[in-house]
């Protein structure tokens, strides 16, 4: 009986963890789609308060324009990975641009709000 309870607990726990990762992955995909459509307000809605202050609509627009100037036009996303760094959940989405590939690193706080958003070289973590 004890083994059954432990097994059920572990299955439930893994389902909750997977659900959390899946939600963060979906939010990260929404960010990329919103960048492509110049819908920066949708991105900001997923930010925590610090990010809302640091990256208003104008700065997000500038970030995306600069990326497209330096890296070429955005083409597609491919590999998606997830990680846990201290108390933060992190998703990495490989973004393919015309001239190079970058990873979009999205850091989530415990409330599933974006607490960090970075475009980094594809081999960096």
What residues fall within each predicted segment?
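Short, low-complexity N-terminal intrinsically disordered segments enriched in polar/charged residues
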Residues: 16-33
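Short solvent-exposed beta->alpha transition segments
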Residues: 26, 41-86
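Exposed beta-sheet edge and beta->alpha loop/turn motif
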Residues: 79-125
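Sec-dependent N-terminal signal peptides
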Residues: 4-19
